[in-house]
């Protein structure tokens, strides 16, 4: 009888628990530097890989989707709706995050972080509407990729996808190339995601070993706040979007199936 392989979420959960155990062991042994020198680098590599894959996935998936429409009128309509949807959902996420952060902070549930000696906390400055609008449009392709500016990446994808469509037969090679590259990047993304247990284990072991067991309570509170925010955001944005754009009732299981 073939053994059933553990699902990825189960592997991540086990890695989380093992990371806590290993981190506590090194903390009480008084050797947290071992996790810093030999475990944290692997966690950093995993985080770097996640950052690396985001832009190619968004860019190629959008170009592939736009090209598959085959109609520039649809591209224009979908393009501005995508940008508008991104801005609205991001704004809602920011508001939810600020509300939950203030509630938890005023209740004294969040840990207080101490600044390193000599470090200065710089207050964020708000940009006006026109600056935000200008910032959506890229001036340098590679700079948009380097900074992972998702709005600019979306605009680049819309422009390139529209260019491929309007090029007609001459754009066929580019279309085939995008489809092939997207298939490849999907495989790369699947591989990186499969490394999640390693990333979770190494980072959790390092955090617990260097911060001590008291960090577990703080992390639990922060994660709890984050997941509450995710749930509220999903209900407000994605459930409403499913009903508005696809006519799907998220509460009715039959309509989803």
Question: Can you annotate each of these PLM segments?
Answer:
Residues 256:
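Conserved small/polar residues in nucleotide/adenosyl-binding loops
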Residues 3, 9, 13, 20-32, ...:
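Signature of multi-pass transmembrane helix bundles
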Residues 34-44:
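Perimembrane loop-to-helix junctions flanking transmembrane segments
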């Amino acid at each position: 009888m073939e053994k059933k392989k553990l699902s990825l979420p189960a592997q991540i959960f086990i890695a989380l628990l093992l990371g806590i155990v290993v981190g506590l062991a090194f903390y009480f042994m008084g050797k947290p530097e071992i996790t810093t020198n030999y475990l944290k680098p692997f966690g950093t590599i995993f985080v770097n890989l996640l950052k690396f894959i985001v832009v190619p996935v968004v860019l190629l998936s959008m170009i592939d989707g736009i090209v598959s429409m085959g109609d520039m009128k649809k591209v224009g309509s979908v393009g501005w709706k995508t940008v508008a949807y991104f801005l609205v959902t991001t704004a809602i996420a920011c508001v939810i995050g600020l509300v939950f952060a203030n509630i938890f902070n005023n209740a004294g549930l969040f840990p207080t972080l101490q600044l390193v000696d000599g470090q200065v906390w710089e207050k964020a400055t708000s940009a006006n509407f026109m600056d935000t609008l200008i910032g959506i449009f890229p001036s340098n392709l590679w700079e948009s990729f380097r900074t992972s500016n998702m709005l600019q990446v979306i605009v680049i994808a819309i422009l390139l996808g529209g260019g491929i469509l309007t090029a007609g037969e001459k754009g066929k090679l580019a279309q085939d190339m995008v489809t092939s590259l997207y298939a490849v990047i999907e495989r790369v993304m699947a591989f990186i995601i499969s490394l999640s247990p390693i990333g979770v284990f190494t980072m959790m072991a390092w955090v617990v070993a260097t911060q001590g067991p008291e960090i577990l309570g703080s992390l639990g509170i922060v994660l709890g706040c984050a997941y509450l925010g995710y749930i509220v955001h999903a209900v407000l944005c994605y459930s409403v979007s499913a009903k508005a754009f696809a006519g799907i009732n998220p509460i009715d299981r039959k309509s989803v199936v």
